């Protein structure tokens, strides 16, 4: 397939998704899941970072 055809197809799908009058139920659920993952990663890094820096200080 030609690149321009693939690009046109992707552009068309993107326009349909962005301008469609569908409810945001599915996208909202996905966004909430991603937000939850981000919060969990942030909290885990807050807990682990002092441990790692303390471990590095002991190793010096």
From Swiss-Prot:
GO cellular component: extracellular space
GO biological process: antibacterial humoral response; defense response to Gram-negative bacterium; defense response to Gram-positive bacterium; innate immune response
Assigned keywords, A-Z: Antibiotic, Antimicrobial, Immunity, Innate immunity, Secreted, Signal
Localization per record: Secreted
UniProt keyword Signal, yes or no: yes
Signal peptide boundaries: 1-24
Pfam family of the protein (one): Cecropin
Main location: secreted
InterPro entries: Cecropin (IPR000875), Cecropin_insect (IPR020400)
S-S pairs: none
Top-rank taxon: Eukaryota
Function as written in the Swiss-Prot or TrEMBL entry: Putative antimicrobial peptide. Partially neutralizes lipopolysaccharides (LPS). Exhibits anti-inflammatory properties: inhibits LPS-induced iNOS/NOS2 transcription, nitric oxide (NO) and pro-inflammatory cytokine production in mouse macrophages and human peripheral blood mononuclear cells (PBMCs); inhibits LPS-induced activation of MAPK and NF-kappa-B signaling pathways in mouse macrophages.
Family of this protein: Belongs to the cecropin family.
UniProt-recorded name of the protein: Cecropin-B1
The organism of origin for this protein: Aedes aegypti (Yellowfever mosquito)
